[in-house]
Amino acid sequence: AAAAAVGSRSKAVIPVDLFGQMAPIEAVRAEIPTLPLIEDAAQSIGASRMIDGKKVMAGEGATIGTFSFFPSKNLGGYGDGGMMVTQDEAIALRLKRLRVHGGAKQYFHDEVGYNSRLDALQAAVLVAKLPHLSHWSAGRRANAAYYDSAFADIPEIVTPYIDPANESIFNQYTIRVERRDALQAFLKEKGIGSAIYYPLPLHLQPCFQYLGYREGQCPVAEAAAKSVLSIPVFPELTSAQLDEVVGTVRAFYGR
């Protein structure tokens, strides 16, 4: 439980939306009502969740919502970029200061900030792409549904679980599979792309070893890192391409 990890130095809680599906932010808020929530919505722009009978969009229900416009995201720019949203006016004003060296007035700095402005080129690309986001998300959901059906009879594959309260935008279509590395090699041999998100859990990353974490402390994350594989789900996939992916995966498992 998240509450067990909260200590005297805790400043905020960061629920992470993974693979296009929102985290249960209302449950986190109920469990830890005294701390602000910063929703990591980098992979979920356009996703939604029903909370108390209301449709809440990704980034909307937290104290701050953060989005990524990295080119690989569902709404990607031409290069790096991102956005933070909030309904708190004081936080919004501070974020605006921080993005431009910590000052509201040029050459006057109220605090130490950053050079984090979205450049005009990225903004132009995103403005052109934004009207298509809903259509692209629908295409991803349709492709995901096709995969769900096509893999339903293969016990070696676990398709993505989608919380009934959520509408995912499938930033990735990530399956858990047996013989993951062999399957990925087989797909590559057939000219089909795939990716592992993510091969090493955070607690085992070299940069965090000073904290004393060791293998076996987060068994679910470790098992996932050894079994997950993301296959193509982008909305431009043709029926023939979908069939090729499905047929190749099924052939690997002798189906």
Range-by-range predicted roles:
Residues A1-G77, M83-V85, S230:
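Active-site phosphate-binding strand-loop segment of PLP-dependent enzymes
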Residues A4, A12-V16, Q21, I25-A27, ...:
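PLP-dependent aminotransferase class I/II
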